[in-house]
Amino acid sequence: RFYSSRDETVIQIEIEPGVNDVNDALVFSFKAMSQLANISKTHFTHSVLVMHFGNTTLPVVAKTDLECAKGFFIYVSENESQWRKNCLTIQDH
């Protein structure tokens, strides 16, 4: 899904990761969105990942600023820990 909100242009995907695969799924998903945004003609500012865990729990929503995330996913000048600390926001809804 692609949308604009306020001053943001967002790329969003929704996934249903296994309980044991949450971290790998999170990193893989944000890497894919970062790579797509990097080659896109549209200037995306943020990526959003919505993770669903069955019918009984509320989804977890993670968001990253794409410019900030480039250091980890595109340029490989930062590590995952730096990306999580500086660029990633996770909320349960």
Q: Which residue ranges define each predicted feature?
A:
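Short, non-transmembrane amphipathic alpha-helical segments
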Residues: 22-44
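Polar/charged, Gly/Pro-rich intrinsically disordered segments
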Residues: 1-17, 41-93
